[in-house]
Regions:
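Positively charged, solvent-exposed patches that mediate nucleic-acid binding
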Residues: 1-111
């Protein structure tokens, strides 16, 4: 299993990001929100933090945890655009405990 996160996999470009937000399906959790756009030719991912989270240290820690979660579970995500928005509740969890099998859709279906 390739657990790397190459730069080519990071979603970039203002137009593409705003298009992804408009055409996405949303999955909610207490710790983060996942937005996904499935019909896209390659796997792209974006990591963000809610605006409510104050302090650069907290925001950076949340993004680090999200990247780690994605890297470790990369094979469970379909090809498409994935946007992870972290919430402050994520800081209360240890990095090795972040695992949400209930909200990760299987590779075969739409949901």
């Amino acid at each position: 299993v390739n657990e790397r996160l190459p730069k080519s996999e990071i979603l970039r470009g203002r137009k593409l990001i705003s298009w992804a937000f408009k055409n996405s399906k949303t999955l909610y959790s207490d710790e983060f929100v996942i937005l996904r756009v499935c019909p896209y030719g390659e796997r792209k991912v974006l990591f963000a933090v809610e605006r409510k989270v104050k302090g650069a240290v907290k925001r950076n820690r949340i993004k680090r945890l999200l990247r780690e979660f994605y890297r470790k579970n990369k094979d469970k995500f379909q090809v498409g655009i994935w946007i992870f928005i972290g919430r402050e509740a994520l800081l209360r969890i240890k990095s090795h405990e972040i695992n949400f099998p209930l909200i990760i859709p299987d590779k075969g279906g739409e949901g």
